[in-house]
């Protein structure tokens, strides 16, 4: 083996050793740093930003009436066809929705319904926890959409998810603990 080949081999060895040392330094640095995983839902909860597109909600006007004029533009523009609006006219001739349902199991949360609404009656809020065991529970009606909270002015952080009062704590009964949890799920 010539001297040039020996130098090249030594150089390659030191280069790989330097790369290995850099990788190990980075690995040990992350190993001893604080974790970045959020302990959801036990100890931490994420607050979405105000521009986050979560659950739908319907707005009311100054008199407390629903803002929706049942023009059905939101239902027509929806790419998932998950909005159903049935209009009716009251005695004054104003249009209102007799039925307004959104199937959130099919919804993409794209916000096109919010953009298409001429009365600014429908909007997407910040709630992201609305899972269910039944897909029928994910169909939200007009009264439920009116009762949902709107957008918060602040957001984009992590807050403690610990309960402040003991009255909200749910205690599992003896038969709900352990391996029998799946027997208590209602099947529809």
From Swiss-Prot:
NDH-1 is composed of 14 different subunits. Subunits NuoA, H, J, K, L, M, N constitute the membrane sector of the complex. Belongs to the complex I 23 kDa subunit family. Binds 2 [4Fe-4S] clusters per subunit. The lineage of its organism: Bacteria, Pseudomonadati, Pseudomonadota, Alphaproteobacteria, Hyphomicrobiales. This is NADH-quinone oxidoreductase subunit I 2. [4Fe-4S] cluster 2 binds at residues 78, 107, 110, 113. Gene3D superfamilies: 3.30.70.3270. SUPFAM superfamilies: 4Fe-4S ferredoxins. It is an enzyme of class 7 (translocase). NDH-1 shuttles electrons from NADH, via FMN and iron-sulfur (Fe-S) centers, to quinones in the respiratory chain. The immediate electron acceptor for the enzyme in this species is believed to be ubiquinone. Couples the redox reaction to proton translocation (for every two electrons transferred, four hydrogen ions are translocated across the cytoplasmic membrane), and thus conserves the redox energy in a proton gradient. Its EC number is 7.1.1.-. GO terms for molecular function: 4 iron, 4 sulfur cluster binding; iron ion binding; NADH:ubiquinone reductase (non-electrogenic) activity; quinone binding.
């Amino acid at each position: 083996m010539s001297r040039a080949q020996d130098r090249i081999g030594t150089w390659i060895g030191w280069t790989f050793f330097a790369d290995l040392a850099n990788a190990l330094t980075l690995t040990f640095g992350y190993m001893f740093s604080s974790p970045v995983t959020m302990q959801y839902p036990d100890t931490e909860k994420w607050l979405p930003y105000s521009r986050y597109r979560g659950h739908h909600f319907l707005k009311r006007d100054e008199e407390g009436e629903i803002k929706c004029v049942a023009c059905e533009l939101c239902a027509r523009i929806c790419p998932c066809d998950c909005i159903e609006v049935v209009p009716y006219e009251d005695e004054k001739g104003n249009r209102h929705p007799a039925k307004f349902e959104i199937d959130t199991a099919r919804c993409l949360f794209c916000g096109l319904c919010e953009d298409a609404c001429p009365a600014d009656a429908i909007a997407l809020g910040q709630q992201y926890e609305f899972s269910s065991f039944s897909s029928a529970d994910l169909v939200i009606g007009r009264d439920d959409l009116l009762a949902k909270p709107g957008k918060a002015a602040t957001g984009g952080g992590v807050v403690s998810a610990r309960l402040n009062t003991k009255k909200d704590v749910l205690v599992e009964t003896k038969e709900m603990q352990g391996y029998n949890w799946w027997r208590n799920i209602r099947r529809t």
